[in-house]
């Protein structure tokens, strides 16, 4: 078993009690493979959830496609020596750690489909393509539980901190990416009223006005010499100048103490936040919401957001996984919602011009069916590119039980294929997802997600994309073509890295509260 303490059922005991913890195996792996995986974890490290995945990364500069980097066993690891949680990917054939991501408090774990999960990593957007949906669901539940507990603990500490200073032009954050300016209109929210922190201003040019700054006040003139007469001086029409500094304002629903009012958000703002993968917790966090507010104001305010959203077509919500057979023999039990072998399209999220545009399907030999209209997308479902297809073809019977595994359940049939190209008028289609590399010779039996497990056992080396990595060094990020959604995602990823680094210091102060959680 693990090189740490022997696995015993239950959760960690109280302060001073014996460590009672066990490693959770995967049903897709054989006993000796689970055993080997536990040995790779390290001293006093426990896996709370284990399954088989493909690791996809949306690499810079454009982050327009998913690139499959590794294939292996993923573990949600409780690392007691470091007093932190990690998502770690191990290669069973290589016998080593392939990739890891530490869990930070502001991490937003999204599930566009039951088998494809995504979140912002330290360097780029990360996607996990699971071989088994039930194990994927258990993995997601554990990750979100730990994120929620950490956020609750830190929100209690932040209530005692003073509110952040008001956003002033001289105090703008200098790390925002350059985005082409969006012209603002003069129609929007209520006009007039006091100019508060929650208002976006648009200048109305008027060359005929005088130098007076405020409507209804006299133009500045020489001071009176007679104090007695100046106290009761009447103001005539000649003393009143034309209005100046008149501005049209639109409300974005933000204040420096409570963040954005999530219950009264403008629909276009809500759509922008949904596409960029921003959660309600981030919108109500004082520091994070100030960063988002500054970004919106720098890009042209609410009118720029409205113009950006008007250029985007409404996107359909994700359909249920299609289980119906198609073409070459069907994937197994359960009738699919598509019927007749025509798969439904998964969600298309993100801006067509942004960091994560929709991807056309991998060439399968036939034209895909038209998308099924479903209405507008649900909130909170935006940001990363759509899920990639499984490793190999989608036809054929389910994979047989693995030899010597003692009869573990076989993985479920594959989910529906990726979406077709976007409709005309919604912008140029982004480059397609490159075909998933497979081994030479005849395809592995079982197809679909069973082949993903075979890749791990056989140790297939997946093709990398060195060109994309070289371009990320040679070229600056292509912010010009990303639009507001992609630029906002880029800003939030920077914010995640800052919070991640600052959490290391905060965790030191909260060690006394977490002593019961970690094993010595």
From Swiss-Prot:
Residues 504-520 have a biased composition (Acidic residues). One of its GO terms (biological process) is regulation of lamellipodium assembly. SUPFAM superfamilies: PH domain-like, Wiscott-Aldrich syndrome protein, WASP, C-terminal domain. InterPro entries: CRIB_dom, CRIB_dom_sf, PH-like_dom_sf, WAS_C, WASPfam_EVH1, WH1/EVH1_dom, WH2_dom. The modification Phosphoserine is found at residues 501-502. CDD domains: CRIB (cd00132), EVH1_WASP-like (cd01205). Its main location: cytoplasm. It comes from the Eukaryota. GO terms for cellular component: actin filament; cell-cell junction; cytosol; nucleus; phagocytic vesicle; plasma membrane; site of double-strand break; vesicle membrane. Phosphorylated at Tyr-293 by FYN and HCK, inducing WAS effector activity after TCR engagement. Phosphorylation at Tyr-293 enhances WAS activity in promoting actin polymerization and filopodia formation. Residues 1-23, 148-247, 307-520 are annotated as: Disordered. GO terms for molecular function: actin binding; identical protein binding; phospholipase binding; protein kinase binding; SH3 domain binding; small GTPase binding. The modification Phosphotyrosine is found at residue 293. GRSGPLPPXP motif repeats lie at residues 354-363, 393-402. Keywords: Cytoplasm, Cytoskeleton, Nucleus, Phosphoprotein, Repeat. It is found in: Cytoplasm, Cytoskeleton; Nucleus. Residues 41-150 form the WH1 domain. Effector protein for Rho-type GTPases that regulates actin filament reorganization via its interaction with the Arp2/3 complex. Important for efficient actin polymerization. Possible regulator of lymphocyte and platelet function. Mediates actin filament reorganization and the formation of actin pedestals upon infection by pathogenic bacteria. In addition to its role in the cytoplasmic cytoskeleton, also promotes actin polymerization in the nucleus, thereby regulating gene transcription and repair of damaged DNA. The WH1 (Wasp homology 1) domain may bind a Pro-rich ligand. Binds the Arp2/3 complex. Interacts with CDC42, RAC, NCK, HCK, FYN, SRC kinase FGR, BTK, ABL1, PSTPIP1, WIP, and to the p85 subunit of PLC-gamma. Interacts (via C-terminus) with ALDOA. Interacts with NCK1 (via SH3 domains). Interacts with FCHSD2. This is Actin nucleation-promoting factor WAS. It comes from Mus musculus.
